[in-house]
């Protein structure tokens, strides 16, 4: 077994269709418990998944306005949305790296910091141990046009010795 693998395919069960995006917009202010209880009214819709998306979007509305406005972005969990950096904080962190650096984010999470660092970096390697976070990050990076990011699903302690040389490591672990 390899110590890590590069995520190449996005899980189809996490994909947002045009109907999903519209549903999320239409129900953004709804009571989420009631929405879950009325799931039978929406055949063909994965209501638990969509409720999770609405809950996560509520978490990021103020701190990630550009991501909130982009209906194509996926959020793997509400906790990821709670713990992620704000756009303002991520932009500040971006100023701490040099132009054209290669960077490795050892604690990828939702990918906010990775995305902002990638706007300045030559290449960024995003490492995250949770597969769903990796799948969502790969999807979101693609939607955002961040083509200089490699997504790696691995435990950081195992993967770090196998990584190519980089100019900087970034680490901001979950605090829960």
Question: What function would you assign to each model-found segment?
Answer:
Residues 1-176:
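SAM-dependent transferase fold signal centered on methyltransferase-like domains
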């Amino acid at each position: 077994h390899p110590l890590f693998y590069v995520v190449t395919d996005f899980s189809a069960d996490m994909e947002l269709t045009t109907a999903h995006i519209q549903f999320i917009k239409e129900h953004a202010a709804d009571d989420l418990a009631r929405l879950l209880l009325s799931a039978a009214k929406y055949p063909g819709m994965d209501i638990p998944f969509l409720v999770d998306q609405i809950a996560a979007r509520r978490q990021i509305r103020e701190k990630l306005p550009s991501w909130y406005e982009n209906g194509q972005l996926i959020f793997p969990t509400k906790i990821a949305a709670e713990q992620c950096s704000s756009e303002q904080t991520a932009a500040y962190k971006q100023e701490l790296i040099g132009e054209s650096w290669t960077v490795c984010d050892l604690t990828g999470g939702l990918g906010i910091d990775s995305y902002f660092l990638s706007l300045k970096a030559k290449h960024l390697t995003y490492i995250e141990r949770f597969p769903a976070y990796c799948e969502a990050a790969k999807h979101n990076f693609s939607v955002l046009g961040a083509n200089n990011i490699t997504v790696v699903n691995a435990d950081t302690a195992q993967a770090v010795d196998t990584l190519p040389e980089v100019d900087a490591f970034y680490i901001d672990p979950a605090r829960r």
